[in-house]
Regions:
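Canonical tetratricopeptide repeat
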Residues: 91-94, 125, 159-161, 195, ...
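Terminal, low-structured helical/coil segments at or just beyond the last alpha-helical repeat
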Residues: 38-43, 218-270
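Structural marker of alpha-solenoid helical repeat scaffolds
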Residues: 47, 81, 115, 149-151, ...
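Bacterial Sec signal peptide processing site at the extreme N-terminus
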Residues: 28-51
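Register position in tetratricopeptide repeats
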Residues: 64, 98-99, 132-133, 149, ...
Length: 270
């Protein structure tokens, strides 16, 4: 079983999907276990736009703590004021995606982008949704559009997600270009560093792969299963049996139920 088979056998989730609420900013992180509500029905402010914004903000907080019913309640109140708010549609999409109602989620994402095609956060989340459904061609197309927005704060992560989509399509050269762009904007992006390590190793450049892995370890003191797998592959390619044994022990001890460990074990048994 070749290295490339191991790499391609693992579907790496796009970053925004891993975090789910990545594009909601730091809302969830700012919560301290409670959500501050407002009273007075929909009359939170004399300014309708401000009221919608507050309701959507509340909904995002509820999404951050997994309270889907209160999230939907606030979004419904916001929609009573502005039936065509892209922000409301997007937040509804995140709720439905989280509750496994994928048809509804997609409809809401599409509604958001129809109202405001320039809302890159919504497009990035929609692309992550498509990726989660295995619709990699569509995801790649949407992530590519997101990366074209030079003012989008999440652009470096969008390049990472673009690279991950291209990997799933077997477009390794194009994936490497996307990861390189991501690293030019954020040199400490652990996902891009890790995937570049795999790509360089597969290209036969063990030294560069080791450099990327070293940079990855500097950003991730506790390595992920995929990080340990890269360490294993580099050690194997370099003939470093001591390091290989060390990484194998770490992968077996820390992540015995991981896909990476199962794949490594299958490889050793062939």
């Amino acid at each position: 079983m070749s290295h490339s088979v191991i790499v391609q056998s693992l579907v790496v989730k796009p970053v925004s999907l891993i975090l789910l609420c990545l594009c909601l900013g730091s809302v969830a992180a700012a919560l301290s276990g409670c959500v501050t509500e407002y009273s007075g029905g929909t009359q939170m402010s004399a300014d309708p736009d401000a009221t919608v914004e507050k309701r959507v903000s509340l909904a995002r907080q509820y999404i951050g703590v997994g309270d889907w019913e209160n999230a939907k309640r606030n979004l419904e109140l916001a929609q009573q004021i502005d039936p065509n708010s892209a922000e409301v549609f997007e937040a509804f999409a995140l709720v439905y995606q989280s509750t496994g109602e994928n048809v509804l989620a997609e409809a809401q994402f599409q509604a958001a982008l129809q109202v405001d095609p320039s809302l890159s956060r919504a497009r990035n989340n929609y692309a992550a949704f498509l990726y989660s459904q295995g619709r990699f061609v569509e995801a790649e197309r949407e992530f590519k559009r997101v990366t074209g927005d030079t003012l989008y704060s999440g652009r470096p992560m969008a390049f990472v997600n673009l690279g991950l989509s291209r990997l799933q399509l077997g477009e390794k050269k194009e994936a490497e270009a996307a990861f390189t762009r991501a690293l030019s904007m954020d040199r400490r992006n652990s996902v891009a560093l890790l995937e570049m390590g795999f790509l360089r190793l597969e290209a036969g450049d063990t030294g560069e792969a080791a450099r990327y892995h070293s940079d990855y370890r500097a950003t991730a003191p506790t390595q992920s299963p995929r990080g340990l797998l890269l360490g294993l592959e580099i050690a194997r390619a370099a003939g470093d049996t001591d390091t290989l044994s060390s990484y194998e022990l770490a992968l077996r001890s820390l992540y015995p139920d991981s896909s990476e460990y199962r794949l490594w074990e299958e490889r050793q048994n062939r």
